[in-house]
Amino acid sequence: MSVIGRIHSFESCGTVDGPGIRFITFFQGCLMRCLYCHNRDTWDTHGGKEVTVEDLMKEVVTYRHFMNASGGGVTASGGEAILQAEFVRDWFRACKKEGIHTCLDTNGFVRRYDPVIDELLEVTDLVMLDLKQMNDEIHQNLVGVSNHRTLEFAKYLANKNVKVWIRYVVVPGWSDDDDSAHRLGEFTRDMGNVEKIELLPYHELGKHKWVAMGEEYKLDGVKPPKKETMERVKGILEQYGHKVMF
């Protein structure tokens, strides 16, 4: 019996969630509560719609030409895709049979290391790992949970030599300070599997979703970081031998 997945939506020709042109599936459900989340409507684990791997593959193969020509592929995003690891594993297996590159965009909040996680990673070409904040106290205030599980997953990926791009959102007043950047650099310094760090400037593009759901957007008034701030954080991380982009 095939596993059923629950998704929020998909994007057929994404260009910012992995290399090349990508088919991105936004999976429903997330256990983090990031104050800056721009997909607030993906949190509910019972929301979205049910799909099968076959449903997704019918869509994916339609865009195979664009993916192949650009060095692209598929990306499992969210919400948090790893909450549906069994389904994502099956979807990625189907993609690999078609020669399609696979990317897992995750916050790394892994609750249990069972064989499914390893089976998923075996068919994952790239993991884009969101490291929100290395200071656990700030992390808990920013996203609602400890960073312990995410950092353990980062170490797990390093030990298995899984190719990783780290994503770090630069939020003024929360993650734009020198200490936070140095902590990130120190943590990842010896992780040879990390190809690069992507700095993502904070934005308010998802604010309207919070408002539509009748909820307070607690970062209201926080402005995107200035270019000088991004350059400063980039410079600190480069001191640790990383390729850094924004």
UniProtKB/Swiss-Prot annotation:
Catalytic activity: glycyl-[formate C-acetyltransferase] + reduced [flavodoxin] + S-adenosyl-L-methionine = glycin-2-yl radical-[formate C-acetyltransferase] + semiquinone [flavodoxin] + 5'-deoxyadenosine + L-methionine + H(+)
Cofactor(s) it depends on: [4Fe-4S] cluster
Residues involved in [4Fe-4S] cluster binding: C30, C34, C37
Chain positions recorded as S-adenosyl-L-methionine binding sites: Y36, C37, H38, G79, D130, L131, K132, H203
Subcellular localization, as worded in the UniProt entry: Cytoplasm
GO cellular component, one term: cytosol
UniProt-recorded Gene Ontology molecular function terms: 4 iron, 4 sulfur cluster binding; [formate-C-acetyltransferase]-activating enzyme activity; oxidoreductase activity; potassium ion binding
CDD domains: Radical_SAM
Domain Radical SAM core positions: 16-239
Pfam families: Fer4_12, Radical_SAM
Cofactor-binding details, from the entry: Binds 1 [4Fe-4S] cluster. The cluster is coordinated with 3 cysteines and an exchangeable S-adenosyl-L-methionine.
Role of this protein: Activation of pyruvate formate-lyase 1 under anaerobic conditions by generation of an organic free radical, using S-adenosylmethionine and reduced flavodoxin as cosubstrates to produce 5'-deoxy-adenosine.
Oligomeric and partner information: Monomer.
Family membership: Belongs to the organic radical-activating enzymes family.
Name used for this protein in its record: Pyruvate formate-lyase 1-activating enzyme
Upper taxonomic lineage: Bacteria, Pseudomonadati, Pseudomonadota, Gammaproteobacteria, Enterobacterales
